Amino acid sequence: MNNNISITTEALSKAHLHSFKHHASSVNGILLGKADKNSILITDIIPLFHTQTLLPMFEVAMIQIEKYCRDNNIDMVGYYHSNQCIANELEPEPIAKKIADRLNNELNNMCFLMISKIEVNRPSGLVSIDKVGSDWLKNRKTLITIDTTSNSEDINEILKRNLQNIKESQIYDFEEYLSNPTRDWLNKSLVL
């Protein structure tokens, strides 16, 4: 359980664009940044999948992400997931729980975030999910703040502009990379 979770506007935009691109599917990805005992700062994301997450594909993705993190002195700090069914937006699907369990066993300090609607009481559109016993449950106490150090523009305006410019078509997940290796699964060329 983390007392403080912050996410940059760029990382937040990428996560939402991934869910917008595959709005009829579940999507998931890895959160990158820095973590200590009491806080996590999410500075980037790596979109993973938008259809069934299969263990062999996940293993290959994790090997690549671990290498990328080592080479760039950045940490894996968590996992994000968006359900296919919006009516059940805050109850993680079974595969999301399995992936979160695996990462929770491997990472010292991690967060599990569900992508939701952006609302007044939830400006990031993210909800923290915590491990409670053997299950993952919504944490009503953790506030996820938006780190505006590099961009103080309102997240709603950023997402609106990105959607108007059809930026969701320019974000690629690891699954798309496996189908077409010319796709930039790190999304380094994506300008938001």
UniProtKB/Swiss-Prot annotation:
Gene3D superfamilies: Cytidine Deaminase, domain 2 (3.40.140.10). It comes from the Eukaryota. GO terms for cellular component: EMC complex. Residues 5-135 form the MPN domain. InterPro entries: EMC8/9 (IPR005366), MPN (IPR037518). Pfam families: UPF0172. PANTHER family: ER MEMBRANE PROTEIN COMPLEX, ER MEMBRANE PROTEIN COMPLEX SUBUNIT 8_9 HOMOLOG. Belongs to the EMC8/EMC9 family. This is ER membrane protein complex subunit 8/9 homolog. It comes from Dictyostelium discoideum.
